[in-house]
Amino acid sequence: MSSLVLAINAGSSSLKFQLIRMPEETLVTKGLIERIGIKDSIFTIEVNGEKIKDVKDIKDHEEAINIMLDSFKQHGIIDDINDIAGTGHRVVHGGELFPTSALVTDKVEEQIESLSELAPLHNPANLMGIRAFRKLLPNIPHVAVFDTSFHQSMPEQSYLYSLPYQYYKDYGIRKYGFHGTSHKYVSQRAAEIMNKPIEELRIISCHIGNGASIAAIDGGESIDTSMGFTPLAGVTMGTRSGNIDPALIPFIMQKTGQNAEEVLNVLNKESGLLGISGTSSDLRDLESDAEEGKERAQLALDVFASRIHKYIGSYATRMHGVDVIVFTAGVGENSSTVRAKVLEGLEFMGIYWDPKKNETIRGEEGFINYPHSPVKVIVIPTNEEVMIARDTVKFGEL
């Protein structure tokens, strides 16, 4: 039997939503509420392919949800709020408490709150959304879907840092990894496209957007990933540095007079592609600048690709080979230039990619390898919302 599931991503002043019909996985409507609690809030909803925008003051998440539900009825999307069978909520950090998604109870709410020190910008906002929905729709299941859960299958040798073991025991200092919902979705989809059991596949998933992470997925389980204790670690990103020598932090403090928080802000918001190029964090800008002969833009692209190269080589070694490489997220799905730079020189690994196919695929699903290539290369648009809806059906027992 069909049911309507809401996939929710609540920020501190925003609420993204998708209404999905399950198990068909068809999108009914989607939208975004911005500037919640700020003057001139913006409510946007897509109805029959047309975007409808309304500007009005929305004081909090509860009011935002009520406006969203009223809009569903007003546009004939639902007849009654009881048509909604369940809600699924993106939660950034589940720590070690949540190796899977979870049906939200008062105890689960408390546990999400207890993990807020691991994701101070996100978990409190995600929780605000959950609480508002539980209050307004008390008779349906609400499910929390964690960005970190998929990576909880990593073995100790992958997630432990070479620090005093007591730091892990006392403070939970370890690699958690992020983008898990995306990596899980594209790995499952890759197995479907290849018509092979996921248990037989070694997949390297490259989620490349403004934030980027690489994951080694062996038999459907994450065994390693590039992001760490926070999403700052790993490859070069739009404004994030990725991995650096930790001794640089006190050195930069000494040289610039900045405190630790200020240096951390530089690493998060002024580094990466923006830091190297000096002009932009957007790969599209850097690609056109590089074509015009701007050396720093080209350098930023080269550094970016080389860091991803390292992880592909490393993860192929960890899994004793690789069967498929997946590109996903904004850049991975749309930039043939970045894909080409990442794949260049990997023929020795059995990766033979077709430049023509690579050029033609943009924002759609498809193979970009030659038919004879032992390792397949697939572009797969990610769909975290469908993954959230699937887990809402599963854990909400719909």
From Swiss-Prot:
Gene Ontology biological process terms, A to Z: acetate metabolic process; acetyl-CoA biosynthetic process
UniProt similarity note: Belongs to the acetokinase family.
Residues annotated as catalytic: 147 (proton donor/acceptor)
Subunit structure: Homodimer.
EC number of this enzyme: 2.7.2.1
Residue ranges that the Swiss-Prot or TrEMBL entry lists as coiled coil: none
Top-rank EC class of the record's enzyme: transferase
Cofactor annotation comment: Mg(2+). Can also accept Mn(2+).
Domain of life of the native organism: Bacteria
Residues annotated to bind ATP: 16, 207-211, 282-284, 330-334
Gene, per the UniProt record: ackA
Keyword presence, Metal-binding: yes
Pfam family for this entry, one: Acetate_kinase
NCBIfam families: ackA
Name assigned to this protein: Acetate kinase
Lineage: Bacteria, Bacillati, Bacillota, Bacilli, Bacillales
Positions with a binding annotation for Mg(2+): 9, 384
Compartments where located: Cytoplasm
Gene3D superfamilies, A to Z: 3.30.420.40
Pathway involvement of the protein, from the record: Metabolic intermediate biosynthesis; acetyl-CoA biosynthesis; acetyl-CoA from acetate: step 1/2
Record site feature (Transition state stabilizer), residues: 179, 240
Function: Catalyzes the formation of acetyl phosphate from acetate and ATP. Can also catalyze the reverse reaction.
Binding site for substrate: 90
PANTHER family registered for this protein in UniProt: ACETATE KINASE, ACETATE KINASE-RELATED
Keyword Kinase among record annotations: yes
